[in-house]
Each structure stands twice: as C-alpha cells, then as structure tokens.
Amino acid sequence: MAEASERLYRVQYAKSGRASCKKCSESIPKDSLRMAIMVQSPMFDGKVPHWYHFSCFWKVGQSIRHPDVEVDGFSELRWDDQQKVKKTAEAGGVAGKGQDGSGGKAEKTLGDFAAEYAKSNRSMCKGCLEKIEKGQMRLSKKMVDPEKPQLGMIDRWYHPTCFVKKRDELGFRPEYSASQLKGFSLLSAEDKEALKKQLPAIKNEGKRKGDEVDGTDEVAKKKSRKETDKYSKLEKALKAQNELIWNIKDELKKACSTNDLKELLIFNQQQVPSGESAILDRVADGMAFGALLPCKECSGQLVFKSDAYYCTGDVTAWTKCMVKTQNPSRKEWVTPKEFREISYLKKLKVKKQDRIFPPESSAPITVHWPLSVTSAPTAVNSSAPADKPLSNMKILTLGKLSQNKDEAKAVIEKLGGKLTGSANKASLCISIKKEVEKMNKKMEEVKEANIRVVSEDFLQDVSASTKSLQDLLSAHSLSPWGAEVKAEPGEVVAPRGKSAAPSKKSKGCFKEEGVNKSEKRMKLTLKGGAAVDPDSGLEHSAHVLEKGGKVFSATLGLVDIVKGTNSYYKLQLLEDDKESRYWIFRSWGRLGTVIGSNKLEQMPSKEEAVEQFMKLYEEKTGNAWHSKNFTKYPKKFYPLEIDYGQDEEAVKKLTVKPGTKSKLPKPVQELVGMIFDVDSMKKALVEYEIDLQKMPLGKLSRRQIQAAYSILSEVQQPVSQGSSESQILDLSNRFYTLIPHDFGMKKPPLLNNADSVQAKVEMLDNLLDIEVAYSLLRGGSDDSSKDPIDVNYEKLKTDIKVVDRDSEEAEVIRKYVKNTHATTHNAYDLEVIDIFKIEREGESQRYKPFRQLHNRRLLWHGSRTTNFAGILSQGLRIAPPEAPVTGYMFGKGIYFADMVSKSANYCHTSQGDPIGLIMLGEVALGNMYELKHASHISKLPKGKHSVKGLGKTTPDPSASITLEGVEVPLGTGIPSGVNDTALLYNEYIVYDIAQVNLKYLLKLKFNFKTSLW
C-alpha cells in the first residue's frame, strides 16, 4: 500500500525494473528517474503512485510550478536531477530533446490545458456554475476531483472568459499562450484569433534606466544583490551537502551488502526500515550528520523527509506522533571494529555538521486531498451558490404532484437544477409516498439506480431552510434506498455510494459509480448468530460458523486523521448449510464509499478454516481471537461491537402496516406508529453522518456508545486548555473508530472545539434513545393475535388517553401554546393536532415525595420524535456519567422551558416533516439557583433544588394560573427586567429524575411561513 502523502506528485529513482509507464506502457529501468501522480486506489483506503518515465510524465499534461514544495522526494534526488526537474517545470513541462534519456522529442503542447467545442450541453462551467451550451468553445484544466479522487486527473471545464479570470488560480502561467492549449489547432480561425487575444503570453519587461526615482531603485538593487549572494551561498552549501550524501551512498553500495548496512543501523541504535533504498538513506544520513536520538515525546525513530525530520513513532496505540524538527538531537555515528576492515569505512572521516535545509518556499502548498476541520455536516452541493442549491443536479419527477411538469421544471431550474426523464441520469427523484408504495416499473428503475426519493415539500424547504442540503434530503426522504446525493461534476457522473465494497467485476477507475450494483444498500441475511455478508455470494447457501459460543464474524475499524484514512475490515468464517465446506470471506475499504474490495477463499477443512480466521484476526488487530481483554496496537484495527442478532424479523413484524385489530383510539394508534417509525430513526442517524452500512440501525452496543461518551469527556479538557494536537488527534481517532462515520473522501474532522464536542454529545444522546426504541421493537412477546401497534403500545408502559378537544384542560393547554410562542421564533406557527394525557408506570409514586415541595410548575420539554420511545418507557433521563459536563449549558440535568417555542425548536421539524411531539411535565423546582450565564453545575449549592437560567423575556406572571397547586405560566411574553444575561428566555433544570412527573404529550404541526410560491 502506498505511503500517505499530502502531495499529489512523487519523484524517485526506480527501485526495480518491474513498473511500467502509464503513458507509453514501456518498463521503467531500475535506477532511472521516474515521476508519479498519486491517485486514490479503488481497491483500498489509500493512495497509489501512477509511475511515468521522466519525459512521459510531462507529456500527460502535468503543470508543476514549485517542485521543492509540490513533489514528494524532490530533495532526496541527486543535485543534477533536482536541477533537471526544476528547469523542466520552469519551462512549462517541456523536457527538451535528449533530456529524458530516450532521445525523444518532447511535446510543446500543454497537456493539462485544453480547448474544444462542447460535445453536449451537459457540462457546467466551474467558474460561474452556468451551463456550457453544445458547440460553444470551452477550456479545461485537468484536476483531481476531491470527492472522487479515484478518477484521477479529469477535465474541469470553463467558459473562456471565466478561464481568463481564473488564469493565475488555475496555474496558467504568464509565459503560456493560447496556442499551447491542447486542441487549439482544431479551432476555427476566428476562435483562434479571439483566444490568442484573451490568453496572450505576458512578457516581464525590465525597468528602464529613467524609471529610477531618488535613488530608491539603487537601494533595492543593493538589497537584491545581498539576497542573491546569500541565496547563492546557500545553494552552494546545499549542493555540497547533496554531493557528500550521494558520495557516501555510492561508496556504501560498492563496499557493503544490505545486511552490512542493517548491522550498522542496529549497532547505532537506529530502527531498520523496509526496502534497500530506505536502509541506504538512513545509514548515509547517520554517517554524514550523526546517529539520531529517539524522539523526546514518544521515543520513536526520527526519519528525514524532504523538509524536516519526522517522528515515525506513536503517541498512543491510536495515534502517531506529530513531532517534526530540523534540528534533531544526535550522537556520534560509530563504526564497529569488525567493519573497519572495509577500506571505505576505515578511511571515511566526516566532520560533524548539521543538515542544511533549503529556505521555506513562498509558494503556497496546494493540498490536493480534501481536508476538513469543522464538525458541522457538509452541504451536499457545497460549490453551489446559496440561491441555487440544486446546481449541477438532474431531477426526475414521478407521480401526480401538486404542480404540473412545467411548473415543477421552472422551480427546479430556478434552484439551479435540471429536469430529466431518465432514472439513470438523475441525481434525485421527487415523488409522493403512494408512488413509492405502489412501486411501478418507473419507480423500480429509480430503486435499481439507487436514486433517493424525496417529497415535493423538499423544493419549498431547500430555498427557505437554514439546514444543510443533506439534512433536508434526510428529512424529506420517502425511500429506504438511495445513495448520497451529489452534484454532477461536468460530464463525469460518479455519485458516491455507501456499499462496503465494489463488485468483483469492477476494475480500475469507476466511470459511472452510480450504477454499480454493490452500491445498493446491503440486505443482511440472518442465520443463527450473525448476518452473512451478501458480497460473499453465499448468503443463501451458507451461515457464519459458531463454535464454543463464539460467532466467527468480526467487523473492524481504523481511523487515522493525519493520513486521512477511515477504514473498515470485515472477516467471516462461513460454513455450508448442507455439506462440510468452509470459506473465509473478507472485505475491506473506506467507510461511506465504493472504495474497497473483497476476497472469498475456500478452505480444505474446518480446522484449517478456523486456523486461518484466527491468523487473519491476529494479523489485523494484534490480538488473539480468544483473548478476553482486547489491547489496541498502533496501526492495527479495533473491533466494533456490532450485534447482527436474530431479532431482525421481530422488528419487521412490528413495523409492518398495522391491521384493524387494534383497540386503541385512532390518535393513539397514529402516535405509536410515529414513535416507532424505523425510517425516521434512520434519517436521524444519516443527519449525524453515521454510516448505516457499517453500523446498521440498533446494532451498535450500548457499551460502545458509553465508551464514546467517555472519550468526549476526555476531549473537553484538552479543548478548553489548548493542549497538544497529539492528544486531540488521539481522542478524535478513538471516537471515530468506536462510532463509524461516513465522511466520503473527506478527512475525519478533529474534535478540537467546544461546538464539535457539543454536536457529538447530541448525536450520542440521540443514539441512546434510538437504541432504546429499537431494543423495544426487538424485545417482548411475539403474540401474532395482537395488532403490531398494540404490542408496541404495551412496551411504552405508559397510559395514554386522548384529551377531549372541548374540555377545559385542552383549552388551557392551547392557550399556553398560543401565548408563549416567542417573537424571535417567527419561522413557524404552532397548531395543536392532538393532546394526550399520559401517566408513566411508577412515575407518580417516584414523584410523591416532591409533591409537598413548593414552587411546582407545568413546563415544556421538546425532543426529536425518535427519542419518545425512550422518554415514555424510561422517563426523562439525565445524561450518563460518561458524558462530558461541558456538553450542556448548566451541566447534566433535565431541561425545561416556559416558552413553548423554545422547547419546540428541539423537535427538529422541517417543511417536509412538519409534525413534532412536545411534552408538559410537572416539575418540582423548590428553591431555584438563578444564573445568567453558562455554568457547568455538577452539584447544587446547599438549600437549592433546581437551576433557573434567567431570560430577557418571561411569561407575564400576573396571567399565570394554578391547577391543583401547580403553576401554569401561560401569560404572554414580557420583558423580565434582567438585561445582563446570555439567555433570551428562561430555562429550568433539575438534577434528580424524581422531580419530574410527565403529564401531557402534544402532537403539533409546525406551519412554516416561508414558501417558494
């Protein structure tokens, strides 16, 4: 596997004669100069070099301006070859006759820039994001698409005027001209002339003598001469140093065997690397400058790489050391007595010196592989303008929508998209629920192409909502299938899927990933203790072996933020259902992408299969299969506790469309169906970038979620104290390994600020509640005589009664909703659909001691619909001890509000999903500890029973009413008189679950005010 590098290019002397040139297909001779483009491998989570002869490299259109910055391995070349690379780069990639050793004439055309007439009207200008019409002249620059780096260098098209505006940014140098564009000769005479005027070669004319003013130019010249002299001296020193190192290498190659060199490294307490050239480099470095002492931070081995010495050790089992220095500590290099017989080593005397480094280039380092330092979910179409969120997308409409086709087309085009009639070309499908349920031929094509289906309301929300496009797609999704929606990159259509591995038939780069069969969501076939991976092709004829109570199936994860890896490895031992036949199946790749592969290997016997399984497991994790206590080792995988249990069928039975057997009132039936909606649970996880392929709903263990909480607790200290990057890296790597995330080709973001920690705390809170809901669905009786709705209702252990709309209590509650809607929460109005009176089993008894406490109020608590199965069955809970206290404004407690809209905001509804649930609970507040700013409370002051966060607005206290000793603050909002507070509205927090008695559950419709029409 290739070594990870942020640089797109690599140069070195060929280590063997086995590699062939990607341009001419001829072999590259050993020790000859070769150059490579680093390309994402389609087979594993890493990059591989595509090697070229030196001259061929420039012919395929590579434009390098600063080889010392852009090319990995440049400084390790011989001095003459460094100059050769520099001069060729300066000449715009023209190697010149005879320069490549083959004597071939180099091409003068710029291979990475092209001009042509658009072959269709499908491409989009990367400058203005407008369509390029068929037959219109267009210019391109070959670049790596950060979302699909496995495609390598692809054309990115521009209108000529847009290209001219971005000339410098695109690397079209001043000395380049239009006539050097590939395809220029095929343009019409008129277009050639126009393009020559737009893209002329710009000559840098020197100043005339008469330009000098008051001697200032003379001062500048003297300064320039000084800098030139200084640079010239440094160049000479670097050249002498380079020649010294290469002289040592050349002599060592003649005088010593590879084993001799290894012995020299071991004697000087240096690690022995793999590969002859690496061993030679390390010995030469030690002889020239001294033996390197271990890293002070981790005791690892320091190694020279281009611009510094980097530590190759590990701070912890999860994270590599980040130490980098140009002045490492050294000791004298010692040659053992037995080696002094070698004449060269006997004569060699090197004066102790420090390694000289070239000055840091002022050229910006272009990072070609996508980086991410934010924890917020990335917009699906991040390149799109704010007013055109559907730019580069093709939309298919199916079924009878509220608008006719022309109206829908107008709206879609207004948002930057295009209407299409083909499922294979579509990025997204807009339809209605009935069409998905009906599953006609056209919808089957949509499913086959793995295109996500969303409701028509999505078009309204996408222009009005502040949520990311991914969140809106999740909220409006109608289909259980669907790859992540991506904008179309010009003419290369390659939406990213979420399959564990590509089809065995797929070879090389993916031309059209969207139609890859393996991209469809995996259907896991459960047999006995685990699910057989469908990529094995044996899901219907074999099962996972279970022996001694242990299931021979393992899902492993490895995250390294520095390298940008987010890898999985799956291992299964499969046994034939009928015969004594055994297979080892393994799959590997990058989470959330089609990058990866798999292997099915038939074994001669059960014993050999078990032995091979255990060998592979130990190779990947460093742990024996039967070891009870797992130890994480550096660069090794970590097992995920994913439960592929036998309860899936029970879930399916209880989520089927309810029949007519239910004796519950219709509103209660609808409420229970809403609470246990599995699709809503999946949508919630997708919003948090959870990878549902590697962590199917309900499959991650509670223990692993709690371990993730503990990591976030550890993160809060280094984040608040500004600790070392290594510590934050370590904790981030551990977190993302425990909770598999889908980041596509982006690097996993560091958990390096309070907001990112807060977002992940919220994610784990929801994961826990979803885990409760799913556990309820899986557990309990399998009584086929009962309606599924009734079975699920019983699991809530809550008496739910519909409140008569005309009753006095319903009137009071509606008034409370109307009066306490805050003026700043003006994006929607709230409409009460149903009011339910609830009584949780055992809660009244638990609350009994607090009934005598003064200051009891009826307050609001809002949450996602997916959390209500957990809330009703287990009550409102305080975050677990493992959760970080900084994830909550006033510490870990249960939060309430007296303004309905403050709590309603936590329902996370949208125009496409406007129904939310909110609760009213009787809360025993007693003596309140009043605060104006965040305070991470872990223990209340003596004599206090709760915290009140003071807001600038409060319900009018004169309008409050009292029902059975409980205050209902249903007055309209008025200024509270508290101005120096961080809160707009009041918050109430209790730290004992027994202080809460849930009374009512409201089903609300959020009537959003913003619309496209």
UniProtKB/Swiss-Prot annotation:
InterPro entries: ARTD/PARP, BRCT_dom, BRCT_dom_sf, PADR1_C_dom_sf, PARP, PARP1-like_PADR1_N, PARP1-like_PADR1_Zn_ribbon, Poly(ADP-ribose)pol_cat_dom. Residues 200-226, 489-508 are annotated as: Disordered. It catalyses: NAD(+) + (ADP-D-ribosyl)n-acceptor = nicotinamide + (ADP-D-ribosyl)n+1-acceptor + H(+); L-seryl-[protein] + NAD(+) = O-(ADP-D-ribosyl)-L-seryl-[protein] + nicotinamide + H(+); L-aspartyl-[protein] + NAD(+) = 4-O-(ADP-D-ribosyl)-L-aspartyl-[protein] + nicotinamide; L-glutamyl-[protein] + NAD(+) = 5-O-(ADP-D-ribosyl)-L-glutamyl-[protein] + nicotinamide. Zn(2+) 2 binds at residues 125, 128, 159, 162. Residues 373-523 are annotated as: Automodification domain. Changing residue 387 to A: Does not affect mono-ADP-ribosylation by SIRT6. NAD(+) binds at residues 861-863, 870, 877, 903. Residues 541-637 form the WGR domain. Keywords: Acetylation, ADP-ribosylation, Allosteric enzyme, Apoptosis, Chromosome, Cytoplasm, DNA damage, DNA repair, DNA-binding, Glycosyltransferase, Immunity, Innate immunity, Isopeptide bond, Metal-binding, NAD, Nucleotidyltransferase, Nucleus, Phosphoprotein, Repeat, S-nitrosylation, Transcription, Transcription regulation, Transferase, Ubl conjugation, Zinc, Zinc-finger. GO terms for biological process: apoptotic process; ATP generation from poly-ADP-D-ribose; base-excision repair; behavioral response to cocaine; cellular response to oxidative stress; cellular response to superoxide; decidualization; DNA ADP-ribosylation. The record marks 214-215 as: Cleavage. The modification N6-(ADP-ribosyl)lysine is found at residue 520. Its EC number is 2.4.2.30, 2.4.2.-. The active site is at residue 987. Zn(2+) 3 binds at residues 295, 298, 311, 321. GO terms for cellular component: chromatin; cytoplasm; cytosol; mitochondrion; nuclear replication fork; nucleolus; nucleoplasm; nucleus. The modification Phosphoserine is found at residues 41, 177, 179, 185, 274, 277, 781, 785. ADP-ribosyltransferase activity is regulated via an allosteric activation mechanism. In absence of activation signal, PARP1 is autoinhibited by the PARP alpha-helical domain (also named HD region), which prevents effective NAD(+)-binding. Activity is highly stimulated by signals, such as DNA strand breaks. Binding to damaged DNA unfolds the PARP alpha-helical domain, relieving autoinhibition. The modification N6-acetyllysine is found at residues 97, 105, 131, 599, 620. It is found in: Chromosome; Nucleus; Nucleus, Nucleolus; Cytoplasm, Cytosol. A motif (Nuclear localization signal) lies at residues 207-209, 221-226. Residues 494-503 have a biased composition (Low complexity). Widely expressed. Expression is correlated with proliferation, with higher levels occurring during early fetal development and organogenesis and in the highly proliferative cell compartments of adult. Expressed in B-cells that have been induced to switch to various Ig isotypes. Homodimer; PARP-type zinc-fingers from separate PARP1 molecules form a dimer module that specifically recognizes DNA strand breaks. Heterodimer; heterodimerizes with PARP2. Interacts (via the PARP catalytic domain) with HPF1. Interacts with NMNAT1. Interacts with nucleosomes; with a preference for nucleosomes containing H2A.X. Interacts with APTX. Component of a base excision repair (BER) complex, containing at least XRCC1, PARP1, PARP2, POLB and LRIG3. Interacts with SRY. The SWAP complex consists of NPM1, NCL, PARP1 and SWAP70. Interacts with TIAM2. This is Poly [ADP-ribose] polymerase 1. It comes from Mus musculus (Mouse). The gene is Parp1.
